[in-house]
From Swiss-Prot:
Keyword Transmembrane helix: yes
Protein name from the UniProt record: Zinc finger protein-like 1
Zinc fingers (B box-type), renumbered ranges: 1-43
Location(s), subcellular: Golgi apparatus, cis-Golgi network membrane
SUPFAM superfamilies: RING/U-box
Transmembrane segments: 275-295
Residue intervals on the Cytoplasmic side: 1-274
Membrane topology designation: Single-pass membrane protein
Keywords, ordered alphabetically: ER-Golgi transport, Golgi apparatus, Membrane, Metal-binding, Transmembrane, Transmembrane helix, Transport, Zinc, Zinc-finger
Protein's organism: Xenopus laevis
Gene of this entry: zfpl1
InterPro entries according to UniProt: ZFPL1, Znf_RING, Znf_RING/FYVE/PHD
Zinc finger (RING-type): 53-101
Keyword Protein transport found: no
Amino acid sequence: MGLCKCPKRKVTNLFCFEHRVNVCEHCLVANHAKCIVQSYLQWLQDSDYNPNCRLCNTLLSSKETARLVCYDLFHWSCLNDLATQQPPNTAPAGYRCPSCQGPVFPPNNLVSPVAATLREKLSTVNWARAGLGLPLIEVAEPVDDTMSHDETDYRDWSVVNSSSDNLSETPETTSQTGYTYNSVAPGAVQQSLNGNMSQDHAVTIRDTGSESVPFNAASSPRKVYDTRENARGQDAVIDFDDDKYRRRPTLNWLARILRNRSGSKSRPASSMQRFLVILIIGVLGFLTLILLMSKLGRASADNDPNLDPLLNPHIHVGKE
């Protein structure tokens, strides 16, 4: 175990054989991408290392490298060629490390910088995307333009020449086509926009020598927007300056609650709110009535002569 020299200062058991320092996985990906890195115990057992790729026996620093989760390092091109030679139906577990026979694909629950870098590199090739559960990349097949531009079939030229001669012999006749557009007058359109619903109008295209084809505006895909609803909505929310300082009635808030402001589209909770307000008002009115009746009853009892003990003949006060 050792302490990495990076600002993270993480405790790690990885050791770079080339620089002879302890490295964490963050430094391994960032600064030691082409170095031989294994555990510190392996360094203590044998400090010798091979700086060449074990697949092509060339220096690892000469090409792009790929580090597996077992920390074995290979040229990415060599590892890709080796995996491409496998059958297309090879299972993900069939791809093994050439050095330690460990898995090439990192486990799904492994979260580390080395595993993330390896997944990103494996996602660029189709054989690895299938093992990672990703959709395959569509490779465009090259189109072979082997047809020679000099090869021409001259067998049908006689037919073309004969047809061109027949066309030249026939007199050229042209006919002009007339178009007639019938629509509603501008005054009627203005009237329909002001108060009435927009009426259907028809467009008729007449061709000289052919029958007329009517087009009905009601069947056209254009939408007809009624701007009167928007105008009514704007009038309802307009707040004039004169109304800002007008004195509101005392029970205006109660009228707003009891009034259905949304018309037919009432909210589900509006009926419940009205019921609660009416219930509270009823309880307050009942309590007020009880309090008023109690005060009036006590006042009438104080002035009642029948309840005065001095006026009762059966009560003698101050007599033996």
